[in-house]
């Protein structure tokens, strides 16, 4: 006698990293539970959404951040688990079993990270209400609540929706806003994509990040880290855990378990700290300029003389001011920047160690191994094996 195999439909946009991670979480539950499910992922379900009731199978896990999906499933008579963002008002939740990413906790994690760095001015770059992204509205609400509770000054800019035809206009308006922010402001972007827009504008305007502005995103999207010169700090959502919990809950529903309407909040995984929030409370303009130059050119084999030329003051003057502000010599900071770049590439890429050594300006692989071992008490290979963030 064979157990009944359930046919389960997943309604997600597989082109989005967040959606893919939710689906991966569903897969992890199937592997762990050995459930007899046949998974159906409709690649272009929007083309047939008006007849959605004809092909749903025995149960559904769906993206309820998408209003169109929520409406299409309103009167469906199969077990449904919605996945989406949390709401600060209970009545905003859809009337289905629901697994939510905790929007308040996501923004709070970013906010606390910036506070720990010594930032005490805050800004939020969101999305316009016309975008229809309810999770963006909730994250903006969370930011306003947090700065009000802590009695900080916080400013919000929703910006424009970006498309190829208005891209430059949107970036120009973002540039106007960024130039109104006082130095040492920490900006929380509603997504990594919006954070990347900030980093691009800062580069065009020669605003040093993180010396003058700090930026943190939400999502920890793999793609974003490769598209910006300054590596982006980000809050990693528990998207896989959401998928796992959704599948686990659906399993209980398929087993006819009686339960009240479930609303499960999934907290963020952690803050992934990178260069964009590596903030030092610097006030001396010459030191800020020198630090920015070093960050951008350390791996090109620069010496102290090039830093002095870039800043335009004498060595004794800059060394004195540098020591007072940073607590290190200029030479030591160049060395530290090269090493940090190498460490970051080891854990965030699959580049060969020899290639990383060359990219970071070391004269030989042997010398790189020697310097790295002295700083971290382990070899570059051993460090990568333990700390790699790359999913192979």
Curated annotation (Swiss-Prot):
Gene3D superfamilies in UniProt: 3.40.50.2300, Homeodomain-like (1.10.10.60)
Q: PROSITE patterns attached here?
A: HTH_ARAC_FAMILY_1 (PS00041), HTH_ARAC_FAMILY_2 (PS01124)
Q: Where is the HTH araC/xylS-type domain?
A: 288-386
GO term, biological process aspect, one: regulation of DNA-templated transcription
Name of the protein in its database record: Xylose operon regulatory protein
* Source organism per UniProt: Escherichia coli (strain K12)
- What domain of life does the UniProt record list for this protein's source? Bacteria
Q: Which Pfam families match?
A: HTH_18, PBP1_XylR, Peripla_BP_3
State the function annotated in the UniProt record.
Answer: Regulatory protein for the xylBAFGHR operon.
GO function terms (MF aspect): DNA-binding transcription factor activity; transcription cis-regulatory region binding
- Indicate yes or no for the key word Ligase: no
Which CDD domains does the UniProt entry name for this protein? PBP1_XylR (cd01543)
SMART domains, per the entry? HTH_ARAC
Gene, per the UniProt record:
xylR
Question: Where's DNA bound on this chain?
Answer: 305-326, 353-376
InterPro entries recorded for this chain?
Answer: Homeodomain-like_sf (IPR009057), HTH_AraC (IPR018060), HTH_AraC-typ_CS (IPR018062), LacI/GalR-like_sensor (IPR046335), Peripla_BP_I (IPR028082), Tscrpt_reg_AraC-type_HTH (IPR020449), XylR_PBP1 (IPR054031)
**The entry's keywords:** DNA-binding, Transcription, Transcription regulation
């Amino acid at each position: 006698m064979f157990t009944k195999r359930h046919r389960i439909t997943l309604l997600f946009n597989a082109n989005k990293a967040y959606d893919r991670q939710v689906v991966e979480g569903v897969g992890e539950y199937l592997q762990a539970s050995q459930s007899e499910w046949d998974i159906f992922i409709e690649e272009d379900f929007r083309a047939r959404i008006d007849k959605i009731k004809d092909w749903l199978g025995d149960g559904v896990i769906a993206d309820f951040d998408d209003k169109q999906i929520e409406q299409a499933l309103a009167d469906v008579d199969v077990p449904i688990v919605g996945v989406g963002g949390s709401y600060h008002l209970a009545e905003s939740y859809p009337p289905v079993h629901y697994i939510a990413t905790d929007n308040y906790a996501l923004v709070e994690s970013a906010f606390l990270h910036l506070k720990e760095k010594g930032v005490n001015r805050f800004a939020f770059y969101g999305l316009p209400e016309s975008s229809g992204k309810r999770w963006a509205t909730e994250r903006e609400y969370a930011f306003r609540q947090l700065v009000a509770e802590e009695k900080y000054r916080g400013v919000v800019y929703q910006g424009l929706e970006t498309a190829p035809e208005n891209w430059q206009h949107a970036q120009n308006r973002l540039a106007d806003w960024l130039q109104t922010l006082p130095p040492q402001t920490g900006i929380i972007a509603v997504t990594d994509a919006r954070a990347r827009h900030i980093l691009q504008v800062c580069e065009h305007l020669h605003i040093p990040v993180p010396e003058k502005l700090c930026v943190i995103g939400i999502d920890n999207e793999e793609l974003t880290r490769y598209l910006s010169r300054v590596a982006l700090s980000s809050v990693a959502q528990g998207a896989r855990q959401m998928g796992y919990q959704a599948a686990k809950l659906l399993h209980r529903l398929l087993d006819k378990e009686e339960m009240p309407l479930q609303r499960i909040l999934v907290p963020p995984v952690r803050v992934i700290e990178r260069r964009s929030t590596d903030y030092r409370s610097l006030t001396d303009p010459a030191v800020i300029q020198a630090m920015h130059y070093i960050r951008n050119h350390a791996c090109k084999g620069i010496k102290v003389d090039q830093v002095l030329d870039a800043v335009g003051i004498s060595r004794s003057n800059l060394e004195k001011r540098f020591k007072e502000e940073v607590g290190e010599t200029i030479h030591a900071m160049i060395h530290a920047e090269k090493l940090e770049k190498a460490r970051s590439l080891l854990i965030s890429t699959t580049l060969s160690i020899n290639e990383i050594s060359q990219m970071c300006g070391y004269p030989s692989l042997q010398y790189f191994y020697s310097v790295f071992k002295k700083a971290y008490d382990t070899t570059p290979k051993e460090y990568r094996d333990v700390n790699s963030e790359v999913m192979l």
